Amino acid sequence: MWPLRFNNRFIDVLPCDPEVSLRSRQVLEAWSRVAPTPVPMPCLLAYSSEVAAILNFDAEELVTPRFVEVFSGNALYTGMQPYAVNYGGHQFGQWVGQLGDGRVITLGELLGADGVYYELQLKGAGPTPYSRGADGRAVLRSSIREFLCSEAMHHLGIPTTRALSLIATGDTVIRDMLYDGHPAPEPSAIVCRVAPSFIRFGTFELPASRGDIDLLRRLVEFTIIRDYPHLHGAGETLYADWFAEICTRTAELVAHWMRVGFVHGVMNTDNMSILGLTIDYGPYGWIDNNDLDWTPNVTDVQSRRYRFGAQPQVAYWNLGCLARALAPLFSDAASLQAGLERFRATYLAAERRDAAAKLGFAACFDEDLELFDALRTCMHQAEMDMTLTFLGLADWEPNMPDSLSLWAEAFYDPVKRDAQAPMLRDWLQRYAARLSVDPLPVAERHERMRLANPRYVLRNYLTQQAIECAEQGDLTELHALLEVMRRPYDFQLGREAYAMRRPEWARSRIGCSMLSCSS
């Protein structure tokens, strides 16, 4: 492993805030120099061995005091030059101006074993000029959620930032979890998150909003050179190709979310990755009973802007915001509009691909989308678990004597189950008729469905149980969840409990059904 060689291309190329202080302020440059604030008693709670291997960390190094000191913000490896990035964003549809890394500090870039440079960030490492008066810390509950979900999403095959380590600080912070006037102390923690780039849509929106076209252009050209080196050309042609690829990646990302039932919860433009990664895990969730209007974010319960079924439309809207920010670099809007159309075409193609895979078809035709939507309607009206519905369908055969037995574990309400049984049986008859003309062999169909329909997803109630145990010093569930989520598509003997539907006690419990942005 040693010596680690850190790169700092972002700060080497882009302009720096001349003021070196933690004073909250408007910053006109791309980044500010800032060091992590030390913590009193750092303790390693968990790490990802896969991410560590990519970054060339030896297994022995991960449990050394030096590693814990560095990734708690108490020390630096040689070559690290910590900084916070400046950006803005649209939040819940409104432009809010400068935001920036309010509690995230980038340590630098490290060349991975796969030949890719990765940025390493500490989330919860203390205040920065962008903290807006906050303490820059993160609570243990939100840190566990980000750590686990980063790794779970990766193993589901969904583009995402990763997590190297989760470290308790030994300190507490005051948070009002539900924003209801009841602040309380909570343990704090720090996550080291890892990605090739943490640049987001809001990185470009901020200078554009200020009319700083020079900085906007410099940011665009830096991002293309570093993060899109396969693109060639110059000027508007290059910029157009770049924007089109961002649209493509974003469409693929959201299609993956919809495939597994993931709800991001806070799709603000400052939470949209320029690489098409899932980024900034806050009040996310997986839909249990199939409700397209469900949002896990308690802040969003009135408008439901970021509800499950709206995610493709929100992604398109966010790309429109990015297009408007980039418009000063183009002579007309045609290239940007072409990129937005690329999003639509890519998403529709991905939706068809995923519907075919989830239903076990060789290809997806228009009538198959109707069949897919009809199943979603059935799931909603019968209050069926999305994950378990598709999992059961993967084991179904038309000659089964009791056609609904495959879904015995998927129903949340027996009354609704009985009421909708005729509709479900009718749907299965239509499905059987479609299978009879599909060219896929039975074994290939089952395997195709197995790879598209996860058995294990990071349900909020599972995460909440791990959080409550960890707050009492018991890390057993945290480590068990991390292990289970490494193989989400496989049957795991002895881990059946992690594949069960949400228990009734978790239906309306805070942390299990609804979450806030408090972290």
Swiss-Prot record:
- Keywords (A to Z) from UniProt: ATP-binding, Magnesium, Manganese, Metal-binding, Nucleotide-binding, Nucleotidyltransferase, Transferase
| EC main group | transferase
Cofactor(s) the record lists: Mg(2+); Mn(2+)
Q: What positions does the entry give for ATP binding?
A: 100, 102-103, 123, 135-136, 193, 200, 280
Q: Does the keyword Manganese apply?
A: yes
* Active site per database record: 270 (proton acceptor)
- As recorded in UniProt, its EC number(s) are 2.7.7.-, 2.7.7.108
User: What's its catalytic activity?
Assistant: L-seryl-[protein] + ATP = 3-O-(5'-adenylyl)-L-seryl-[protein] + diphosphate; L-threonyl-[protein] + ATP = 3-O-(5'-adenylyl)-L-threonyl-[protein] + diphosphate; L-tyrosyl-[protein] + ATP = O-(5'-adenylyl)-L-tyrosyl-[protein] + diphosphate; L-histidyl-[protein] + UTP = N(tele)-(5'-uridylyl)-L-histidyl-[protein] + diphosphate
The entry's Mg(2+)-binding residues are 271, 280
Any GO MF annotation of the entry: ATP binding
Instruction: Write down the InterPro entries for this protein, in alphabetical order.
Output: SelO (IPR003846)
Q: Name one Pfam family in it.
A: SelO
Its biological purpose: Nucleotidyltransferase involved in the post-translational modification of proteins. It can catalyze the addition of adenosine monophosphate (AMP) or uridine monophosphate (UMP) to a protein, resulting in modifications known as AMPylation and UMPylation.
List, alphabetically, the PANTHER family matched: PROTEIN ADENYLYLTRANSFERASE SELO, MITOCHONDRIAL
Q: Which NCBIfam families match?
A: PRK00029.1
**Stored HAMAP family:** YdiU_SelO (MF_00692)
Name the family the entry cites: Belongs to the SELO family.
- Quote the protein name from its UniProt record: Protein nucleotidyltransferase YdiU
Q: Which organism is it from?
A: Xylella fastidiosa (strain Temecula1 / ATCC 700964)
